[in-house]
């Protein structure tokens, strides 16, 4: 086999493979482009901003279909204060909109990033599961003060990916019309 034939064959293979590689890269780009961005404001919780940002980071590194960041036109706001028995909580529609209340007393007692990531989970559509182990982010304070896991587990990640697959798909409601 001549060098010329070998070179021509290599170029031919490269020409055939390049569209596949380009197609694969394009699919990754379009998948990433399909991610919904939820804009957040931390201006109401300046004392805890670093923990909120870290909690958002836990979600951003765990899921692809939704990303959270500080930007203009925030639909999700964080505020700090003393909320008594209610403690830290989220008032949200579960679609990336609402207000997350960060409680001073809970932040002094529990893992700060876990609290912010947990409450953000509500804003993304997850419910509490207080009976769950520390490995479940949505077990919240039920896992105790020694729990420092601030990352969603596989089931929580899958739920968010499913819910946010096309932006956020509202829960299906069925009715029978007569």
Regions found by a protein language model. Give the residues of each.
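Short pre-active-site segment immediately N-terminal to the catalytic Zn-binding motif
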Residues: 100-117
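The catalytic-center signature of Zn2+-dependent metalloproteases
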Residues: 110, 123-169
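Secretory targeting and sorting signals
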Residues: 1-27
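Surface-exposed patches in mature extracellular/periplasmic domains of secreted proteins
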Residues: 63-73, 127-133, 171-175
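A short alpha-helix/helix-coil micro-patch that ends at or immediately precedes a cysteine
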Residues: 39-68
